[in-house]
């Protein structure tokens, strides 16, 4: 790596409460020569709050692939650059991937400056398992594509995290109910760190009803945390054992049939018995 090249700093900014900026982020803003931002007007207002004035470079979804090389050239000339998004951590459902990849390929040092991230902030307050999770960004805008995406994730056991917009939230919850079931537990985190912060959890059917009762509840930036599929013991029982259970239970009491099949196939008889209660007449 050329020591004369500049450094690209990936700097997280607040997601609502301006007090959540870090001292390190402010120090980096003072040091860099240029700030790359999604919306330069929005970011200019943000940084002016902290008394920081720096030149901006607009880098957003519509121009990143064409413009990233210009920033790489500036870095190679020795300029230091901070990359920020409109809110939160850059690259998390925000631009920056192409720039960071090009920098790493060019041997330019990339330094992350951690801070707020809406997905992780919502997850830690959701009460849903956080040891394994899957962040999927925004779901598709069209219902058909959205349902297809959700169907592909229907068997996912990890916690699912999505961002969603205010004008699609009710339709999205309806599609979640249709594809994942009315009883799937969902937490909605709205306006995190802001005045009207709301974090509410319920099964998706109840949550959709609650949101629909007051238009104000569907306003603001939203994160959806969906509990992963809870595997039932019967999910692991092979079809041959279940077929045997069905046949034997036609001539013997279900409890006896479950005991016989459990002995033959090595499954728990209680799991087999429960399956029979739920599926056999």
From Swiss-Prot:
MF terms in GO: rRNA (cytosine-2'-O-)-methyltransferase activity
Methyltransferase among keywords: yes
UniProt cross-references to Pfam families, sorted A to Z: RsmI_C (PF23016), TP_methylase (PF00590)
Similarity comment: family membership: Belongs to the methyltransferase superfamily. RsmI family.
Alphabetical list of NCBIfam families matching this protein: 16S rRNA (cytidine(1402)-2'-O)-methyltransferase
Function: Catalyzes the 2'-O-methylation of the ribose of cytidine 1402 (C1402) in 16S rRNA.
Protein's name according to its UniProt entry: Ribosomal RNA small subunit methyltransferase I
Organism: Pasteurella multocida (strain Pm70)
Gene that specifies this protein: rsmI
């Amino acid at each position: 790596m050329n020591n004369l090249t500049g450094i690209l700093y990936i700097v997280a900014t607040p997601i609502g409460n301006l007090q959540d900026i870090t001292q390190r982020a402010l120090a980096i803003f003072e040091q860099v020569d240029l700030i790359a931002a999604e919306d330069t007007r929005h970011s200019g207002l943000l940084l002016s709050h902290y008394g920081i004035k720096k030149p901006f470079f607009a880098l957003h979804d519509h121009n990143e692939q064409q413009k990233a090389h210009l920033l790489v050239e500036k870095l190679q000339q020795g300029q230091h650059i901070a990359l920020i998004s409109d809110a939160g951590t850059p690259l998390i459902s925000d631009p920056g991937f192409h720039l960071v990849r090009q920098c790493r390929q060019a041997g330019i040092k990339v330094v992350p400056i951690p801070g707020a991230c809406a997905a992780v902030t919502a997850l830690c307050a959701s009460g849903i398992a956080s040891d394994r999770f899957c962040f999927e960004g925004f779901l598709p805008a069209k219902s058909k594509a959205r349902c297809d995406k959700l169907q592909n994730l229907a068997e996912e056991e990890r916690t699912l995290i999505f961002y969603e917009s205010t004008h699609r939230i009710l339709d999205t919850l309806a599609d979640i109910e249709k594809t994942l079931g009315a009883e799937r537990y969902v937490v909605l985190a709205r306006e995190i760190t802001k005045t009207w912060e709301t974090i509410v959890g319920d099964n998706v059917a109840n949550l959709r009803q609650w949101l629909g009762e007051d238009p104000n509840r569907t306003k603001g930036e939203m994160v959806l945390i969906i509990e992963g599929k809870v595997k039932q013991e019967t999910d692991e029982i092979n079809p041959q054992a279940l077929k045997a259970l069905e046949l034997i239970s036609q001539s013997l009491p279900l409890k006896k049939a479950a005991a016989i099949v459990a002995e033959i196939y090595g499954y728990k008889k209680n799991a087999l018995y429960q399956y029979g209660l739920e599926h056999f007449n």
